[in-house]
């Protein structure tokens, strides 16, 4: 975040109407010899109680202590932006209410879809539409792995190690390969269109650990691609959500989303079909 604010300093200042300066960085560690060494603080209350601070960006990850910190910032009248999907999936509705009660914004565009701007279109541009379906490739790590298995005939363990070596997969890849990561993301997107909190723990979730090279061969023979999809469909007055590997026809827009890229396919009763595409893992 600090790097982006520095690289695009002039452009950001022009769009904001004034310079955006980083005053504090909250961390347990010290960073001697770096540009932020004099900005490090270890107590979040220093930030919450400083009247000069108008915007807080949370990049900690996890639900706690992020929830405690973010709630305190909103209650102190700070605008908050986060990329923390775990926090938004678990506490998003509560934090949105806290923000509304205190006349500030809780923004979470970066929590879903990597480099794809999907939250704002759903929240702002498509509010008059009845969104009937959201289907997405929402995890760049597993999409990279499935692409490698498809293109090179590699097995699961081999492509997982490759993804870890490249920094796409964590040392503990459970959240990615078991589908927990896209499950949280589809819960967030469904919450937006449903107008109420959708609990990710209620969504059936299956990852890619059982996919074999033989499965890939069968899919290719049928002109299909295996993708880990997170989907949400409107059924009557409710929504049905699912995360699982699918075999999709090679004419489907998502079949061409490969490597670390993400894609989100929307269907609205007025909009019709729309596709959002952009970088996933590593962004």
Model-based region annotation:
Residues 61-63, 139, 248:
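Short glycine-rich anion-binding loops that position phosphate/pyrophosphate groups of nucleotides
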Residues 251-283:
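ATP-dependent carboxylate/acyl-activation modules
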Residues 53, 100-181, 188:
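Rossmann-like NAD(P)H-binding beta-loop-alpha module
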Residues 40-42, 58, 81-83, 89, ...:
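General beta-strand structural signal in soluble alpha/beta enzymes
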Residues 1-76:
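N-terminal glycine-/serine-/threonine-rich beta1-alpha1-beta2 phosphate-ribose binding loop
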Residues 60, 65-76, 83-124:
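Rossmann-fold NAD(P)-binding glycine/threonine-rich loop
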Residues 158-256, 261-263:
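Substrate-binding/catalytic subdomain of NAD(P)-dependent oxidoreductase enzymes
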């Amino acid at each position: 975040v600090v790097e982006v604010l520095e690289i695009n300093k002039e452009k950001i200042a022009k769009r904001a109407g004034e310079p955006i300066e980083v005053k504090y960085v909250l961390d347990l560690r010290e960073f001697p010899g770096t540009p932020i060494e004099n900005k490090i603080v270890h107590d979040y209350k220093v930030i919450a109680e400083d009247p000069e601070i108008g915007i807080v960006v949370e990049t900690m990850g996890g639900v706690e202590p992020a929830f405690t910190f973010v709630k305190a910032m909103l209650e102190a009248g700070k605008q908050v932006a986060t990329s923390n999907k775990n926090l938004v999936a678990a506490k998003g509705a509560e934090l949105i209410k806290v923000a509304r009660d205190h006349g500030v914004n809780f923004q979470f565009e970066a929590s879903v879809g990597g480099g794809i701007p999907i939250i704002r279109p759903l929240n702002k541009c498509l509010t008059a539409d009845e969104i009937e379906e959201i289907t997405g490739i929402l995890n760049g790590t597993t999409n990279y792995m499935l692409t490698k298995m498809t293109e090179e005939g590699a097995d699961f363990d081999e492509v997982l190690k490759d993804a870890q070596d490249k920094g796409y997969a964590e040392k503990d890849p459970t959240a990615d390969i078991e589908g927990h990561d896209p499950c949280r993301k589809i819960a967030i997107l469904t919450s937006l269109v449903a107008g109420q909190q959708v609990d990710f723990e209620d969504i059936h979730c299956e990852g890619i650990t059982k996919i074999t090279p033989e499965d890939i061969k069968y899919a290719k023979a049928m002109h299909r691609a295996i993708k880990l999809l997170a989907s949400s469909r409107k059924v009557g007055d409710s929504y049905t959500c699912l995360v699982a590997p699918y075999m999709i026809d090679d004419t489907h827009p998502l079949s061409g989303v490969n490597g670390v890229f993400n894609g989100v396919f929307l269907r609205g009763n007025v909009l019709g079909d729309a596709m959002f595409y952009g970088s996933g893992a590593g962004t």
